[in-house]
From Swiss-Prot:
Occurrences of domain PPM-type phosphatase (ranges): 76-346
Protein name per the record: Probable protein phosphatase 2C 47
Parts forming coiled coils: none
Matches recorded under PANTHER family: PROTEIN PHOSPHATASE 2C, PROTEIN PHOSPHATASE 2C 49-RELATED
Originating organism: Oryza sativa subsp. japonica
Cofactor remark: Binds 2 magnesium or manganese ions per subunit.
Family of the protein in this entry: Belongs to the PP2C family.
Binding residue positions for Mn(2+) 2: D120, D294, D337
Lineage: Eukaryota, Viridiplantae, Streptophyta, Embryophyta, Tracheophyta
Keyword Manganese: yes
Length: 389
């Protein structure tokens, strides 16, 4: 049980066995191999189930092993953006690996702490650029943003409430800023890490994908017309879907800005800025998080993206290079949009490839074993080799 956190509220200023292998060719080599062979070793991977909380209740979540509770994420990240085939670049992103250091001593939060955001603009760059400049202010200058050194349910819920307020306040600010076109809007995908907790908030069709032992775990849902629950909400609020577009105009059903499509503040609107949340407690099984705009996901699956990044980390261990490789793959697959990717690593290194597909299950480690020869087996092998001669 995690110690209860003391939650305070304070305004915060923003700163920007090696294993032995031998092929015997003769009796002498067999004897030599037996003499230096290590004792029998069998490596077994034990799966750890982690509660996946967010829109669903955390009640009844499976327990977590002691080893999992001792895990501390080792955070590092890389990003890459490309204009793609478009004439203008409308994406923006934020990448802060050490949030506590970035905000200074006035913010008390569980460590390690980090913040990331991807903003995919439409109708011009205005809205996305505004979010890049002001997202930190909306989030962390909130007087009700919780401050605590430990994570408990109260703290997590308070952080979620603060992020929700930040999305909605930013949306209203876009309406009030006379320098921003009312037809300009942006999707918003953010990820907060505090301690071992990962909290993802999403409004729009950017996507966050967690790699858990090689398996893609989607940490957000695309707010598009093919999302059944969104279609129901749109219809209930007086909107409609035509040819895959909200009111025949916009490809997403949630976004910040786009005030030419929204009703006045307080009125029900088919297009909303309300984010959806997903959260999980990170363990040693959670290797990295991919955050990308829809230009990535239009041409590849979440699992494909995870496989590319995982292979890259094993080869060169550079998250920024992995982000670039993912963007280049999307261009090779002829994406039609701008491209932005952030790769956030939670472990210091992946090491050599050990997790292979076993019995149709990706991400399950293949057991390895090392064997030594008994004296009797050695004699039998010697006799067999001599007879074979």
């Amino acid at each position: 049980m995690v110690a209860e956190a003391e939650v305070m509220h304070q305004p915060v200023p923003v700163l920007e066995v090696p294993y032995h292998r031998c092929v015997a060719k003769g009796v002498e080599e067999v004897a030599a191999a037996a003499a230096v062979a290590p004792p029998p070793v069998v490596e077994v991977e034990v799966a750890v189930q982690v509660p996946h909380m967010g829109l669903e209740s955390a009640a009844g979540a499976p327990s977590i092993s002691v080893d999992a509770l001792q895990f501390v994420p080792s955070i590092r990240s890389g990003s890459f953006a490309d204009i793609g085939p478009r004439r203008y670049m409308e994406d923006e992103h934020i990448r802060i690996d050490d949030l506590s250091a970035h905000l200074g001593s006035l913010l008390v939060c569980p460590l390690p702490s980090a913040f990331y955001g991807v903003f995919d603009g439409h109708g011009g760059l205005d809205a996305a650029a505004y979010m890049k400049r002001h997202a930190m202010r909306f989030l962390f200058e909130d007087s009700e943003f919780p401050q605590a050194s430990q994570v408990d349910e109260t703290y997590v819920q308070s952080v979620e409430n603060s992020v929700r307020r930040a999305f909605l306040q930013a949306d209203l600010a876009l309406a009030d800023d006379l320098d921003i076109s009312r037809s300009s809007g942006t999707t918003a995908l953010t990820a907060l890490v505090f301690g071992r907790q990962l909290l993802v908030a999403n409004a729009g069709d950017c996507r966050a994908v967690l790699c858990r032992r090689g398996v893609a775990m989607e940490m957000s849902r695309d707010h598009r017309a093919n999302y059944a629950e969104e279609c129901e909400r749109v219809a209930a609020s007086g909107g409609y879907i035509e040819d895959g577009y909200l009111n025949g105009v916009l490809s997403v059903t949630r976004a910040l800005g786009d005030w030419d499509m929204k009703m006045p503040d307080g009125s029900i609107s088919p297009l909303i800025a309300e984010p959806e949340f997903r959260q999980t407690m990170l363990t040693e099984d959670d290797e990295f998080l991919i955050m990308g705009c829809d230009g990535i996901w239009d041409v590849m699956t979440s699992q494909h993206a995870v496989s590319i990044v995982r292979r890259g980390l094993r080869q060169h261990d550079d998250p920024e290079r992995c982000a670039r490789e993912l963007v280049m793959e999307a261009k090779r697959l002829e994406t039609a949009d701008n491209l932005t990717v952030i790769v956030v690593c939670f472990v210091s290194e992946l090491g050599s490839p050990r997790q292979e597909q076993v019995g149709g299950q990706a991400g399950v480690a293949r057991p390895r074993s090392c064997k030594s020869l008994s004296a009797e087996a050695l004699c039998n092998l010697r006799s067999w080799l001599e007879t074979d001669r």
